Amino acid sequence: SLLYSTNNFSIKDKSDNNTIYQFDIGSLTVGNKSEFDYIESNSNGRTQQIGAPELPTYSFNYSIQNNKNYEVEYVVNTFEIYENIIVDPAQPLQIAGEEKQFIKNDLLYSSFQQYPANNLNVNRMSLRGYELLNIEIIPFEYNFQTKQLKVYHNIDIIINETSDRELSLEVPRSKTFEAIYKNYIINADTYQDSRNFQQPAILYICGGNIESSLYFDE
């Protein structure tokens, strides 16, 4: 997903091969409704596993070089623990006219697992030759047995450039698309690209014999 919540992320440190962003969870409320507890935050993202605990997710898009490989890791700086929490399970989208059903994965809620299994998800994407990392953080640990919810308040997210990457084909830059691309990345102010821009072209769509006329040649 290209959705991102940059207000929760700020640059902390940067070197030639290493960038550190600091995550701050900001406003957060843990409330109760019926037998379940819910989490409200300023995030637009939520975990989507139906019947499993619904947790806020936070993400940003980071521009990268198409000829480099990257690794991302995180360090938790501060956290808070909430006791006796039963996190509300995520529900499917309600369709008008259909009977509302409540779904809860009882097997998961009675397990010894920690949820979520991964707190950091990284997806490399290519948009017409423009490369980026979509970095998603789920700053929570939920223990089904103890009903303990750990909330990461502050995290360092470390992006490391690790090695060269072989390219099969280099797509030229597009001035129009580059302007759109910069709106989606957190590091637009330091974005660099050594590729050449593509030459402007005009596409003609015609029929009949017009393409062979003198007017068309002119």
Name every feature range the model reports, one short phrase each.
Residues 1-218:
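Extracellular pro-sequences of secreted precursors
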